[in-house]
Regions:
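Hydrophobic, glycine- and aromatic-enriched re-entrant/interface helices and adjoining loop segments
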Residues: 1-85, 105-109
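Alpha-helical transmembrane segments of multi-pass membrane proteins
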Residues: 4-7, 116-126, 160
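Transmembrane helix-bundle signature of multi-pass membrane transporters/permeases
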Residues: 61, 73-76, 116-120, 148-151
Length: 170
Protein backbone atom coordinates (compact mmCIF):
# COMPACT_ATOMS: atom_id res chain seq x y z
CA UNK A 1 0.00 0.00 0.00
CA UNK A 2 2.82 2.37 0.87
CA UNK A 3 4.60 1.62 -2.40
CA UNK A 4 1.42 2.30 -4.38
CA UNK A 5 1.04 5.63 -2.58
CA UNK A 6 4.66 6.52 -3.32
CA UNK A 7 4.30 5.62 -7.00
CA UNK A 8 1.09 7.62 -7.24
CA UNK A 9 2.51 10.72 -5.61
CA UNK A 10 5.85 10.74 -7.45
CA UNK A 11 4.42 11.04 -10.96
CA UNK A 12 2.84 14.45 -11.45
CA UNK A 13 -0.01 13.38 -13.69
CA UNK A 14 -0.98 10.55 -11.32
CA UNK A 15 -1.01 12.92 -8.36
CA UNK A 16 -3.14 15.44 -10.26
CA UNK A 17 -5.58 12.72 -11.34
CA UNK A 18 -5.95 11.42 -7.79
CA UNK A 19 -6.34 14.90 -6.30
CA UNK A 20 -8.88 15.89 -8.95
CA UNK A 21 -10.97 12.90 -7.92
CA UNK A 22 -11.44 14.48 -4.48
CA UNK A 23 -12.03 17.99 -5.84
CA UNK A 24 -12.62 18.18 -9.61
CA UNK A 25 -13.47 21.88 -9.29
CA UNK A 26 -9.86 22.68 -8.30
CA UNK A 27 -8.91 22.31 -11.99
CA UNK A 28 -12.21 22.33 -13.92
CA UNK A 29 -10.68 22.92 -17.35
CA UNK A 30 -7.99 20.24 -17.18
CA UNK A 31 -7.93 17.25 -14.83
CA UNK A 32 -11.41 17.78 -13.44
CA UNK A 33 -13.16 18.27 -16.79
CA UNK A 34 -14.25 14.66 -17.35
CA UNK A 35 -15.57 14.19 -13.82
CA UNK A 36 -17.51 17.45 -13.94
CA UNK A 37 -19.00 16.73 -17.36
CA UNK A 38 -19.95 13.19 -16.30
CA UNK A 39 -21.80 14.64 -13.31
CA UNK A 40 -23.54 17.20 -15.51
CA UNK A 41 -24.58 14.50 -17.97
CA UNK A 42 -26.00 12.26 -15.27
CA UNK A 43 -27.87 15.12 -13.63
CA UNK A 44 -29.34 16.18 -16.98
CA UNK A 45 -30.92 12.74 -17.32
CA UNK A 46 -33.06 13.02 -14.23
CA UNK A 47 -35.28 10.12 -13.29
CA UNK A 48 -36.41 9.01 -16.77
CA UNK A 49 -33.74 10.52 -19.05
CA UNK A 50 -33.72 12.86 -22.01
CA UNK A 51 -34.61 10.15 -24.52
CA UNK A 52 -32.59 7.63 -26.47
CA UNK A 53 -30.10 9.49 -28.65
CA UNK A 54 -30.89 12.88 -27.09
CA UNK A 55 -27.68 13.21 -25.07
CA UNK A 56 -25.82 16.49 -25.39
CA UNK A 57 -22.72 15.41 -23.47
CA UNK A 58 -21.61 12.87 -26.07
CA UNK A 59 -21.26 15.57 -28.74
CA UNK A 60 -18.00 16.97 -27.44
CA UNK A 61 -18.53 17.96 -23.82
CA UNK A 62 -17.63 14.58 -22.37
CA UNK A 63 -14.43 13.06 -23.82
CA UNK A 64 -14.48 9.29 -24.40
CA UNK A 65 -18.25 9.22 -23.95
CA UNK A 66 -18.67 6.01 -25.94
CA UNK A 67 -16.00 4.09 -24.04
CA UNK A 68 -14.93 5.23 -20.57
CA UNK A 69 -18.01 7.29 -19.73
CA UNK A 70 -20.80 5.33 -21.37
CA UNK A 71 -22.51 4.92 -17.99
CA UNK A 72 -22.93 8.71 -17.79
CA UNK A 73 -24.50 8.72 -21.26
CA UNK A 74 -26.85 5.88 -20.29
CA UNK A 75 -27.89 7.88 -17.22
CA UNK A 76 -28.37 11.03 -19.32
CA UNK A 77 -30.35 9.43 -22.13
CA UNK A 78 -32.32 6.81 -20.21
CA UNK A 79 -32.31 8.24 -16.70
CA UNK A 80 -31.60 7.19 -13.16
CA UNK A 81 -33.93 4.20 -13.42
CA UNK A 82 -32.00 2.74 -16.38
CA UNK A 83 -28.69 3.41 -14.63
CA UNK A 84 -29.95 1.43 -11.65
CA UNK A 85 -31.06 -1.34 -14.02
CA UNK A 86 -27.54 -1.49 -15.50
CA UNK A 87 -26.12 -1.87 -11.99
CA UNK A 88 -28.74 -4.53 -11.25
CA UNK A 89 -27.75 -6.47 -14.40
CA UNK A 90 -24.13 -6.51 -13.22
CA UNK A 91 -25.26 -7.76 -9.81
CA UNK A 92 -27.21 -10.57 -11.52
CA UNK A 93 -24.14 -11.43 -13.61
CA UNK A 94 -22.08 -11.50 -10.43
CA UNK A 95 -24.55 -13.74 -8.60
CA UNK A 96 -24.79 -16.06 -11.61
CA UNK A 97 -21.01 -16.33 -11.78
CA UNK A 98 -20.71 -16.91 -8.04
CA UNK A 99 -23.38 -19.60 -8.18
CA UNK A 100 -21.62 -21.21 -11.14
CA UNK A 101 -18.28 -21.15 -9.31
CA UNK A 102 -19.77 -22.74 -6.22
CA UNK A 103 -21.57 -25.48 -8.17
CA UNK A 104 -18.87 -26.27 -10.76
CA UNK A 105 -18.03 -29.98 -10.86
CA UNK A 106 -14.25 -29.62 -10.82
CA UNK A 107 -11.54 -27.27 -9.58
CA UNK A 108 -10.80 -25.84 -13.05
CA UNK A 109 -14.44 -24.90 -13.54
CA UNK A 110 -14.54 -23.28 -10.12
CA UNK A 111 -11.45 -21.21 -10.80
CA UNK A 112 -12.57 -20.23 -14.30
CA UNK A 113 -16.01 -19.15 -13.11
CA UNK A 114 -14.63 -17.25 -10.12
CA UNK A 115 -11.92 -15.54 -12.17
CA UNK A 116 -14.17 -14.50 -15.04
CA UNK A 117 -16.86 -13.23 -12.68
CA UNK A 118 -14.33 -11.30 -10.62
CA UNK A 119 -12.83 -9.77 -13.77
CA UNK A 120 -16.18 -8.59 -15.14
CA UNK A 121 -17.41 -7.32 -11.77
CA UNK A 122 -14.22 -5.41 -10.92
CA UNK A 123 -14.18 -3.83 -14.36
CA UNK A 124 -17.82 -2.74 -13.96
CA UNK A 125 -17.17 -1.48 -10.42
CA UNK A 126 -14.13 0.56 -11.46
CA UNK A 127 -15.88 2.09 -14.49
CA UNK A 128 -19.09 3.00 -12.67
CA UNK A 129 -17.12 4.21 -9.64
CA UNK A 130 -15.00 6.48 -11.84
CA UNK A 131 -18.07 7.91 -13.57
CA UNK A 132 -19.75 8.54 -10.22
CA UNK A 133 -16.59 10.19 -8.88
CA UNK A 134 -15.85 7.76 -6.06
CA UNK A 135 -12.81 6.23 -7.80
CA UNK A 136 -10.09 7.84 -9.92
CA UNK A 137 -10.65 7.94 -13.67
CA UNK A 138 -8.67 5.04 -15.11
CA UNK A 139 -10.00 4.42 -18.59
CA UNK A 140 -11.44 0.97 -17.86
CA UNK A 141 -14.33 0.15 -20.23
CA UNK A 142 -17.75 -0.91 -18.98
CA UNK A 143 -18.07 -4.62 -19.89
CA UNK A 144 -20.72 -5.48 -22.50
CA UNK A 145 -21.68 -1.79 -22.90
CA UNK A 146 -18.64 0.29 -23.90
CA UNK A 147 -17.65 0.73 -27.53
CA UNK A 148 -14.49 -1.12 -28.41
CA UNK A 149 -13.82 -4.26 -30.37
CA UNK A 150 -11.10 -5.96 -28.37
CA UNK A 151 -12.77 -5.43 -25.00
CA UNK A 152 -16.10 -6.68 -26.31
CA UNK A 153 -14.55 -9.76 -27.96
CA UNK A 154 -12.60 -10.72 -24.83
CA UNK A 155 -15.56 -10.13 -22.52
CA UNK A 156 -17.95 -12.13 -24.71
CA UNK A 157 -15.42 -14.96 -25.05
CA UNK A 158 -14.91 -15.06 -21.30
CA UNK A 159 -18.65 -15.00 -20.71
CA UNK A 160 -19.02 -17.87 -23.18
CA UNK A 161 -16.53 -19.87 -21.12
CA UNK A 162 -18.53 -19.01 -17.99
CA UNK A 163 -21.74 -20.20 -19.66
CA UNK A 164 -20.01 -23.44 -20.68
CA UNK A 165 -18.93 -24.03 -17.08
CA UNK A 166 -22.52 -23.34 -15.98
CA UNK A 167 -23.80 -25.84 -18.53
CA UNK A 168 -21.50 -28.53 -17.10
CA UNK A 169 -22.83 -28.06 -13.56
CA UNK A 170 -25.32 -30.60 -12.23
Amino acid sequence: VGMMGALTMTAGYRRERLLSMFDPWSDPLNTGWQAIQAGVAMSNGGLWGMGLGASRAKWGFLPFAQTDFIFAIVAEELGFVAALLVILVYLVIGLFGLNTALRAPDRLGQLLAAGITTWIMIQAYVNIGAVLGVLPITGVPLPLVSYGGSSMVLTLTAYGVLLNVARQTP
